[in-house]
Curated annotation (Swiss-Prot):
The modification 2-(S-cysteinyl)pyruvic acid O-phosphothioketal is found at C119. UDP-N-acetyl-alpha-D-glucosamine binds at R95, R124, P125, I126, E127, Q128, D308, V330. Transmembrane segments: none annotated. Phosphoenolpyruvate binds at K22, N23. The gene is murA2. It comes from Staphylococcus saprophyticus subsp. saprophyticus (strain ATCC 15305 / DSM 20229 / NCIMB 8711 / NCTC 7292 / S-41). This is UDP-N-acetylglucosamine 1-carboxyvinyltransferase 2. The active site is at C119. It comes from the Bacteria. It is found in: Cytoplasm.
Length: 421
């Protein structure tokens, strides 16, 4: 069993580079299935277990995938006749596998995709995906753990209003509509930077997607799409995690690949706490010189405060004086890390969807386990400032979303190592 061991107390200084965005590369990889001509080459691809999983899913669909971790690139050739079935063996490992359904429906007119797996955070329903496909003209039914989708006369453009701005549903419907007949208007959509990256990629392939980054996206279907080269945007969640690593240790760190426009709600909250941020071209320098002030956090869909930064921000709030409240509105059951923080002497109580933090916690090193991807990072952040040694286990979660986080922190001066227990 792998374990990360941290001896707390070191101030972090220096420069660090953010890897490519996990939440951008997965939909872009599945969108490569839309290209019936040419080969796609994706650059700045992070070396993550989730990337390997989606590559395996794409390979089972009869696309040729080549993954060069040293070059941080993936090439996808989807010009052959695709298979319709995404099997349970891979899809069960990761929810994002459902994102092959839109491209398969668009290319083949039918798809058979196992119900997905992934992080155990709340219900994360896929009803919005199914609603979108049905409104584009697909017949959907579920049987034996699979979702079956088909369309006799091809997908037809229409107006679709999402009940809530689901990121995955927005991506899946954009991909399906990109080869549909006519115009699709997609309302109340997700506005994340990863949506913009996907739209840019499809447009580079010859598609016609406009409005990404706003709450209404318009897709004019085209007959074919072709492979292209595309660089994945930096990971704003990793960037935020590294900014907090600098802040929590009261350090001085330059985070290359941190783009302010991708993380406005986070940086505003950090500044509200008294963290000094210096904005440069695609980089942010973080410094802390004074006592941090208490702030309240409420997670919301983008551009609100990201749920994927909630647990890391909670770690930082533990080191500030005063009364703080963290409210989680996006996912249910996303306070599982609180029990682990308490093992480290954190003063937190949970009531429903809110966690209350009283005063500054004198964190103590302890053995803790990661309950999900972002909790893993948050526990490591807490370990950076805890008195004594912190051991974080269940690193399979961490490896789904961070490339060499311990190595990057060690290069900044942390006393941290990864071992096999």
């Amino acid at each position: 069993m792998d374990m990360i061991e941290i001896n707390g107390g070191n101030r972090l200084t220096g420069e660090v580079k953010v890897s490519g965005a996990k939440n951008a590369v997965l939909p872009v990889l599945t969108a490569s299935l839309l290209a019936s001509e040419g080969v796609s080459k994706l650059m700045n691809v992070p070396a993550l277990s989730d990337v390997e999983t989606i590559n395996n899913v794409i390979s089972t669909l009869n696309a040729e995938v080549s993954y060069d971790k040293d070059e941080e690139s993936v090439t996808v050739d989807a010009t052959k006749e695709l298979n319709e079935e995404a099997p349970y063996e891979y899809v069960s490992k990761m929810r994002a596998s459902i994102l092959v359904m839109g491209p398969l429906l668009a290319r083949l007119g039918h798809a058979k995709v196992a119900l997905p797996g992934g992080c155990a955070i709340g219900s994360r329903p896929i009803e919005q995906h199914i609603k979108g496909f049905e409104e584009l003209g697909a017949d959907i039914h579920m049987d034996g753990g699979f979702i079956y989708a088909s369309t006799e006369n091809g997908l037809k453009g229409t107006t679709i209003h999402l009940d809530f701005p689901s990121v995955g549903a927005t991506q899946n419907i954009i991909m399906a509509a990109s080869l549909a007949e006519g115009k699709t208007v997609l309302e109340n959509v997700a506005r994340e930077p990863e949506i913009v990256d996907l739209a840019n990629y499809i447009n580079e392939m010859g598609g016609n997607v406009s409005g990404a980054g706003t709450d209404t996206i318009i897709i004019h279907g085209v007959e074919t799409l072709h492979g292209v080269e595309h660089a994945i945007i930096p990971d704003r969640i990793e960037a935020g995690t590294l900014l907090i690593a600098g802040a929590i240790t009261r350090g001085d760190v330059l985070v290359n690949g941190a783009i302010k426009e991708h993380m406005t709600s986070l940086v505003y909250k950090l500044e509200e706490m008294g963290v000094n941020l210096d904005y440069q071209d695609d980089a942010i320098r973080v410094r802390v010189e004074d006592e941090l002030k208490p702030v309240d956090i409420k997670t919301l869909p983008h551009p609100g405060f990201p749920t994927d930064m909630q647990s890391q921000m909670m770690a930082l709030l533990l080191t500030a004086e005063g009364h703080k409240v963290v409210t989680e509105t996006v996912f249910e059951n996303r306070f599982m890390h609180v029990a682990e923080f308490k093992r480290m002497n954190a003063k937190i109580s949970v009531e429903g969807r809110s966690a209350k933090i009283e005063g500054k916690s004198e964190l103590q090193g302890a053995q803790v386990k990661a309950t999900d991807l972002r909790a893993a990072a948050a526990l490591i952040l807490a370990g950076l400032v805890a008195d004594g040694t912190t051991q974080v286990t269940e690193l399979k979660h961490l490896d789904r979303g961070y490339v060499d986080l311990h190595g990057k922190l060690e290069a900044l001066g942390a006393d941290i190592k990864r071992t096999q227990a």
